[in-house]
Design a protein with these regions (language model features):
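Divalent metal-coordination and catalytic microenvironments
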Residues: 34, 41, 88, 118, ...
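Cap/insert and terminal regions of metallo-dependent hydrolase folds
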Residues: 53, 59-62, 122-184
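Short, polar loop motifs at secondary-structure junctions
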Residues: 1, 57-63, 76-79, 119-121
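Helix-loop-beta element that forms the nucleotide-linked donor phosphate-binding surface
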Residues: 64-74
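Short active-site oxyanion
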Residues: 48-54, 112-113
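Pre-active-site segment of Zn-dependent metallo-hydrolases
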Residues: 1-31, 43-47, 120-128
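Active-site metal-binding loops of divalent metal-dependent hydrolases
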Residues: 1-5, 34-35, 93-94, 117-120, ...
Length: 184
């Protein structure tokens, strides 16, 4: 919902969708991995009720508070919380520049998934069976920054660590259109 713009402005980077993604009424929890604009997307967050439960890294807290959200739970890597019948464990994620979060999420029957959007696998995670891994499967580089998504590099390690039934690809671009200097 709404364009994605990275500071300092649209001339630098802008992502747009032709069709808005509708937000379902029955969503009762939000899980944020990072406080960056493409993860903690203000136009999308404005569509939610202010009392929705949000699990996030510290980098997202100030943004969420400014938007008026009232049920914010900050998790640091290795911390766990039980929420809405789920056990949510934060794992160390991408250093952009501070360490952000990945998550292991399991229901009461032990079914669940692992997610980390930049292809960083926390070396402290012990091998375990998990149903699905949500991860990029490609590497992405930025001029003057270098590799910031390491999906192709981490995928074999994720499969070895979690032995997932499913790998769900993220960070592929989808139907988005990108403009700006960063996209050149």
């Amino acid at each position: 919902t709404g364009d994605l713009v990275f500071p300092p402005g649209e001339w630098f980077f802008k992502g747009s969708l032709d069709n808005e993604i509708l937000i379902e009424e029955d969503i009762n929890i939000i899980l944020l991995t990072q406080g960056l604009p493409d993860h903690c997307h203000v136009p999308s967050l404005k569509k939610f009720k202010k009392n929705i439960d949000i699990i996030c890294p510290n980098s997202a807290k100030v943004i969420l508070e400014k938007l008026g959200f009232t049920s914010i739970k900050v998790l640091k890597p290795s911390e766990k919380i039980k929420e809405k019948g789920l056990e949510i464990e934060a794992t160390a994620g991408a250093p952009v520049p501070q360490i952000e979060n990945g998550y292991i999420v399991k229901d009461e029957k032990g079914k669940g998934f692992y997610i980390e959007p930049h292809g960083y696998l926390d070396e402290n995670i012990k091998s375990q069976e998990i149903d699905a891994v949500i991860t990029p499967i490609i590497n992405l580089d930025l001029p003057m920054v270098g590799s910031f998504v390491k999906g192709a590099d981490v995928l074999p390690k994720l499969i070895n660590t979690f032995n997932p039934k499913y790998v769900l690809s993220s960070t592929a671009g989808g139907e988005a259109k990108y403009t700006g200097l960063l996209n050149k």
